[in-house]
Regions:
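A short glycine-rich, Lys/Arg-flanked "PGG" loop and its adjoining helix->strand segment in the class I
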Residues: 32-47
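Substrate-binding/catalytic lobe of Class I Rossmann-like enzymes that use SAM or dcSAM, i.e.
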Residues: 54-56, 60-165, 171-173
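Phosphate/diphosphate-binding loops
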Residues: 4-6, 22-23, 34
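Alpha/beta-hydrolase-fold catalytic nucleophile elbow
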Residues: 51
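Short conserved AdoMet
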Residues: 29, 43, 91
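A short SAM/SAH-binding and catalytic strip from SAM-dependent methyltransferases
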Residues: 17-30
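A short acidic, Gly/Pro-enriched loop at the edge of an enzyme's catalytic core
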Residues: 7-19
């Protein structure tokens, strides 16, 4: 597992049989370059599998437009909410071999479970939040709680048919 800004990531060509991305593409804006890079990193028969959050038809940026725009400022800085069809417009280097669309209600349940788990373990988590966030630990506790609540509401909206989960399997061109 590598944790790094994907825009700065480099590997030798034809290094990987498989690349798996879970909830990373929402933090990227230059899909064309990222798909090109990944295609170089994959072996000839390599596959890319992506899991993303997406909207059923809208793509929109996460941009801080007002002082109280906390989700864009703290959780998705500089990223995009892709539409379910967004990746179909970026197939110069990789081609979508198969695509799956899942109801947002799955993530609604996940976000609610994370919130419940966080609340049940507050005493255990508080020192960790203090270590990571310092004097802002209480603020960040509330941000995370609101994040889970907001995600649960968004992804559960209209029975999970607006904000979705997209899975994609790509092959090299």
């Amino acid at each position: 597992v590598i944790t790094q800004d994907v825009n700065q990531l480099t590997f030798t060509e034809a290094t990987f049989d498989r690349v798996v991305s879970v909830e990373m593409f929402e933090h990227v804006r230059n899909y064309a370059q990222l798909f090109k890079n990944i295609s170089h990193w994959l072996k000839a028969d390599g596959l890319l599998w992506c899991h993303i959050f997406c909207h059923r038809f809208l793509q929109y940026p996460f941009e801080v437009q007002e002082e109280d725009d906390w989700m864009s400022a703290h959780f998705f800085t500089g990223g995009l909410m892709p539409a379910i069809s967004t990746f179909s417009h970026f197939q110069d280097d990789l081609k979508i071999e198969q695509q799956w669309q899942w109801s947002g209600q799955h993530y609604e349940k996940t976000a609610n479970a994370w919130l419940e788990n966080m609340d049940q373990h507050q005493k255990l988590l508080t020192p960790i939040f203090e270590q990571i966030y310092g004097k802002d630990a209480r603020i960040w506790w509330q941000r995370w709680r609101l994040f889970f609540m907001a995600c649960a509401e968004l992804f559960g909206y209209e029975q999970g048919n607006q904000w979705l989960i997209g899975h994609y399997r790509f092959v090299k061109r």
